[in-house]
């Protein structure tokens, strides 16, 4: 999430715009697409073609474990979806909402590595305006996008909510919190979450204004599933205090992971990241 200039901050304060404009300023940095989806003659099967920028780290055999398709949202956009079969005996599937400056092509290698290490399959999607998804990124589209992904995961693959872990990273915590506040699932994982858009731009903000965007802080108490929060203590984009504030509002918090010294984009490089996820998925969820 990019910083606003002084003039832009003054404009926000003096002439508060609608939440959608705040969202666009703060959040969306879609990269040039790192992949394409090619449909076969039947119109039912899509093939994933990665560019060099996707930095694919695995063999063609692992790539065959990835299934891609397009689905339509309630707002009329077609979004790209990806199902990664990482483990044949996986009990859980992560519904993964990624960060603001990547697409599915860039995340595909990470998904295979993560899923195979914590014994979970991974379902992900690109936001409207990202990758092969149509439309433009916006707060309203974020919510419609994850709704479409949730429906596709349940109907196309028959995965029940009690076997879905809703996982959001950075801006991806926004649709994740919104969905989890409306539907119960096995668990929720929030990785470098934000409390709200205004609180990122104005750290001293104490309440949610009508023109605020991404109000996770006002929704998180509605989540009835167990919530694991992960945040780096030296996060330079979304301050560590956001993770703490959300943790304090959770109905069913589990032991959080505060990664000492980690920033916004390197939490997963620390050994305790995988250790905490493994413990949560393979041990704690069984007893919750």
From Swiss-Prot:
It is found in: Cell membrane; Recycling endosome membrane; Cell projection, Dendritic spine; Postsynaptic density membrane. One of its GO terms (cellular component) is postsynaptic density membrane. Pfam families: Hydrolase_4. This is Alpha/beta hydrolase domain-containing protein 17B. It comes from Xenopus tropicalis. The active site is at residues 170, 235, 264. Belongs to the AB hydrolase superfamily. ABHD17 family. The keyword Cell membrane applies. InterPro entries: AB_hydrolase_fold (IPR029058), Hydrolase_4 (IPR022742). Hydrolyzes fatty acids from S-acylated cysteine residues in proteins. Its EC number is 3.1.2.22. Keywords: Cell membrane, Cell projection, Endosome, Hydrolase, Lipoprotein, Membrane, Palmitate, Postsynaptic cell membrane, Synapse. The lineage of its organism: Eukaryota, Metazoa, Chordata, Craniata, Vertebrata. It is a lipid-anchor. The gene is abhd17b. Its main location: membrane. GO terms for molecular function: palmitoyl-(protein) hydrolase activity. The keyword Hydrolase applies. Palmitoylated on cysteine residues located in a cysteine cluster at the N-terminus which promotes membrane localization. It catalyses: S-hexadecanoyl-L-cysteinyl-[protein] + H2O = L-cysteinyl-[protein] + hexadecanoate + H(+).
């Amino acid at each position: 999430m990019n910083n606003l200039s002084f003039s832009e901050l003054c404009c926000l304060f003096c002439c508060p715009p609608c939440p959608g404009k705040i969202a666009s300023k703060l959040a969306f940095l879609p990269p040039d697409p790192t992949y394409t989806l090619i449909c076969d003659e039947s119109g039912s099967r899509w093939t994933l073609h990665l560019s060099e920028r996707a930095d694919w780290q695995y063999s063609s055999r692992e790539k065959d474990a990835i299934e891609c398709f397009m689905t339509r949202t309630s707002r009329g956009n077609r979004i790209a979806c990806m199902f990664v079969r990482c483990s044949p005996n996986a009990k859980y599937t992560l519904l993964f909402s990624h960060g603001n400056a990547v697409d599915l092509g860039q995340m595909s290698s990470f998904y295979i590595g993560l899923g195979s290490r914590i014994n979970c399959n991974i379902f992900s999607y690109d936001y409207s305006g990202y990758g092969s998804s149509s439309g433009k990124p916006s707060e309203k589209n974020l919510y419609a996008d994850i709704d479409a992904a949730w429906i596709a995961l349940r109907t196309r693959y028959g995965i029940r909510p009690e076997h879905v872990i809703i996982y959001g990273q950075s801006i991806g915590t926004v649709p994740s919190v919104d969905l989890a506040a409306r539907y119960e699932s096995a668990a929720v994982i929030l990785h470098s979450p934000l409390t709200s858009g205004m609180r990122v731009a104005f750290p001293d903000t104490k309440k949610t204004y009508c023109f605020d965007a991404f109000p996770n802080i006002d929704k998180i108490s509605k989540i009835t599933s167990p919530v694991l929060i992960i945040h780096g203590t030296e996060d330079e984009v979304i301050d560590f205090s956001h993770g703490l504030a959300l943790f304090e509002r959770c109905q069913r918090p589990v032991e959080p992971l505060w990664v000492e010294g980690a920033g916004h984009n390197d939490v997963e490089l620390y050994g305790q990241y995988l250790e905490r996820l493994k413990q949560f998925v393979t041990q704690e969820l069984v007893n919750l």
